[in-house]
Amino acid sequence: MTDQQAEARSYLSEEMIAEFKAAFDMFDADGGGDISVKELGTVMRMLGQTPTKEELDAIIEEVDEDGSGTIDFEEFLVMMVRQMKEDAKGKSEEELAECFRIFDRNADGYIDPEELAEIFRASGEHVTDEEIESLMKDGDKNNDGRIDFDEFLKMMEGVQ
């Protein structure tokens, strides 16, 4: 078992591994311990993942190193964990987008110093003008006096 495969197993509960194994085994018709790359998308969708054709091609290219056209269960686990992490990343970005919309009170696509101060006041935090200025300086990478969504995402990376 490679380090990558051991890490994938450590990320999953025994229950999840058993669920993945059951799905994997359904497509391992001959019981040989591997499935064809063609069946991979079907198995992933059955397990609640939604890879695009491009994502599936990229995943398969990474996993099927020997070009055999088959993927064993350990390779499958590594791939599923990768896909789960990608899905989680997408969800957290959606949540951050919702936060940004709430913070952007005037809906102009930016958080300005007044809106930032209002966020803290609404949460009961007392912040000084200097603290707001410092936060703006940290988040406002292009120095236009306001924080756009990309700057907000970068700012929030350190918080999560």
Curated annotation (Swiss-Prot):
Modification type N-acetylthreonine: residues: 2
Residues annotated to bind Ca(2+) 2: 64, 66, 68, 70, 75
The EF-hand domain, residue ranges: 15-50, 51-86, 91-126, 127-160
Binding positions (Ca(2+) 3): 104, 106, 108, 110, 115
Disulfide bond entries: none
Binding site for Ca(2+) 1: 28, 30, 34, 39
GO molecular-function terms, A-Z: calcium ion binding
Binding site for Ca(2+) 4: 140, 142, 144, 146, 151
GO cellular component, one term: troponin complex
Effect of residue 79 to I: In CMYO15; affects regulation of muscle contraction
Pfam family, one: EF-hand_7
GO BP of this protein: regulation of muscle contraction; skeletal muscle contraction
Keywords: Acetylation, Calcium, Disease variant, Metal-binding, Muscle protein, Repeat
Domain of life according to the entry: Eukaryota
SMART domains: EFh
Similarity section: Belongs to the troponin C family.
Any further remark recorded for this protein: Skeletal muscle troponin C binds four calcium ions.
PANTHER family: MYOSIN LIGHT CHAIN 1, 3, TROPONIN C2, FAST SKELETAL TYPE
Disease / disorder: Congenital myopathy 15: An autosomal dominant myopathy characterized by neonatal onset of hypotonia, muscle weakness, and respiratory muscle involvement resulting in severe respiratory insufficiency. The disorder improves over time, although forced vital capacity remains decreased. Other features include facial weakness, often with ptosis or external ophthalmoplegia, jaw or distal joint contractures, scoliosis, and osteopenia.
Role of this protein: Troponin is the central regulatory protein of striated muscle contraction. Tn consists of three components: Tn-I which is the inhibitor of actomyosin ATPase, Tn-T which contains the binding site for tropomyosin and Tn-C. The binding of calcium to Tn-C abolishes the inhibitory action of Tn on actin filaments.
Protein name per UniProt: Troponin C, skeletal muscle
Organism: Homo sapiens
Gene: TNNC2
